[in-house]
Curated annotation (Swiss-Prot):
Name under which the protein is recorded: UPF0246 protein stu1967
InterPro entries: YaaA
A cellular component term, taken from the record's GO annotations: cytosol
Family designation: Belongs to the UPF0246 family.
Protein's organism: Streptococcus thermophilus (strain ATCC BAA-250 / LMG 18311)
GO biological-process terms attached to the record: response to hydroperoxide
Amino acid sequence: MIRFLIPTAKEMKPSKEVPSQKLSEKSEAILTEMAKLSTDDLSIAYKIKPEQAEKEKQRWDAILAGEAKNYPAVELFNGLMYRHIKRKDLSTCEKDFLSHQVFITSSFYGIIPAFYPIQEHRHDFHTKVKVNGQSLKNYWRAEYDQFLEEGQVPVVSLLSSEFEDVFSPSLRKQLFTVSFMEDRNGILKTHSTISKKARGAFLTAVMEESCQTIDALRDLSFDDFYYRKDLSSDSELFFVRKVKKV
């Protein structure tokens, strides 16, 4: 069995509403701090325009008042990676895989199962707020580390460094990482758009093939991406797609 870690997304699209889940004490402490911030404060914290900050202020107030609607996390997040993850018309095995083997790393909720009920919000590890005098990364580090220590199974990271940096350096080394590149006339290139789309397509392929070992991941091909043994190591998997000359 393998576990997969994926990041949150700024873009959200409400889906079917589900019953709420009581916030953890750690999330409650963050909520308390976020609810204290004015619209201007949020504009600075998020580096967004005042009108956007007003929307976020309303969201935090709704969560604080217990009035915010709840949605399955993997269905609510709708960034580029999520749009390339198969989320509809899932077989029983595929839904079981998403439910038990895919976890989302959140700076508000901690590490949560894919279908965990969450509210619309904007929050990541770049958010300029301190909780109990700690940065968000330091605040969550012990709980993130505990996830790796308790699991006793291989964990594959589809995270950016923003999220991986939350783990202690010694435990971070335990993560298996996956990188995606394009071969353009013999030159290997990567950028965020390639990576985000490929992460979603990769996870979909893993789910459809029901991969349960790291070796099984190396046998995958998807969206014209193939495993490159020459670029990879024991803990780093590289997949490359050849782009035809135009």
